[in-house]
C-alpha cells in the first residue's frame, strides 16, 4: 500500500461560526506579522478566531480581535493576546478587498489559521451576513444531505 502524500497545510484553528453566520463569497490566503511568542502559541493551537475580522486602513489589511493566548514559557517577553496584526497581502489584493467591502453588509472574516511550509497563514473570506431564515435553511440542507449520505452508505 502506498503512503499518503504528506500535506504541508496543518490547520491550527478554524472559525466554524463564520461559516454559519455568513455566506462566504470568496477566500484569500494571507501571511501575518507575528512576534516570537505568538508563533509558538499558534503552534500550540492556542488561537481563537471566533470574533475576528479584517479592516483595511491606510492601504494595509489588519487582523483585529483575534485572540492568540500568551505563550506559557514566555515570561516578560510575552505578547498582548488581542493586539492587531498586520496581514501580508499584495497591493492588488488589498485594493480588491477594499472594493468588495464598500458594499453594505460585506465584511472580511478569518476562516482558518494553518502552517504552510513553516509559516503561519490565515485564510480570510469576503462574507455577507446571513439572515435567521437563511441559517435555518442551510442547517436543513445539511441535515438532508447527511441523511442521503447515510442511506447510500447503508445500502
UniProtKB/Swiss-Prot annotation:
Keyword RNA-binding: yes
Gene designation: smpB
Alphabetical UniProt keywords: Cytoplasm, RNA-binding
Cross-referenced InterPro entries: SmpB (IPR023620), SsrA-bd_prot (IPR000037), SsrA-bd_prot_CS (IPR020081)
Role, per record: Required for rescue of stalled ribosomes mediated by trans-translation. Binds to transfer-messenger RNA (tmRNA), required for stable association of tmRNA with ribosomes. tmRNA and SmpB together mimic tRNA shape, replacing the anticodon stem-loop with SmpB. tmRNA is encoded by the ssrA gene; the 2 termini fold to resemble tRNA(Ala) and it encodes a 'tag peptide', a short internal open reading frame. During trans-translation Ala-aminoacylated tmRNA acts like a tRNA, entering the A-site of stalled ribosomes, displacing the stalled mRNA.
This protein's GO CC annotations: cytosol
GO molecular function: RNA binding
Organism: Pediococcus pentosaceus (strain ATCC 25745 / CCUG 21536 / LMG 10740 / 183-1w)
Protein name: SsrA-binding protein
Entry similarity comment: Belongs to the SmpB family.
A GO BP entry: trans-translation
Chain positions covered by the region annotation Disordered: 134-155
Compartment annotation: Cytoplasm
NCBIfam families referenced in this protein's UniProt entry, alphabetically: PRK05422.1, smpB
UniProt xrefs under SUPFAM superfamilies: Small protein B (SmpB)
Gene3D superfamilies: 2.40.280.10
Amino acid at each position: 500500500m502506498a503512503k499518503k502524500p504528506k500535506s504541508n497545510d496543518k490547520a491550527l484553528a478554524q472559525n466554524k461560526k463564520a461559516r454559519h453566520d455568513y455566506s462566504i463569497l470568496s477566500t484569500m490566503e494571507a501571511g501575518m506579522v507575528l512576534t516570537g511568542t505568538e508563533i509558538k502559541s499558534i503552534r500550540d493551537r492556542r488561537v481563537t478566531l471566533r470574533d475576528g475580522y479584517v479592516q483595511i486602513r491606510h492601504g494595509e489589511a489588519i487582523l483585529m480581535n483575534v485572540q492568540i493566548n500568551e505563550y506559557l514559557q514566555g515570561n516578560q517577553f510575552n505578547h498582548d493576546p488581542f493586539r492587531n496584526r498586520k496581514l501580508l497581502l499584495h497591493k492588488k489584493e488589498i485594493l480588491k478587498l477594499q472594493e468588495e467591502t464598500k458594499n453594505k453588509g460585506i465584511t472580511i472574516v478569518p476562516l482558518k489559521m494553518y502552517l504552510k511550509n513553516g509559516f503561519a497563514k490565515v485564510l480570510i473570506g469576503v462574507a455577507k451576513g446571513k439572515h435567521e431564515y437563511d441559517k435555518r435553511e442551510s442547517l436543513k440542507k445539511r441535515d438532508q444531505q447527511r441523511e442521503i449520505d447515510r442511506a447510500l452508505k447503508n445500502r
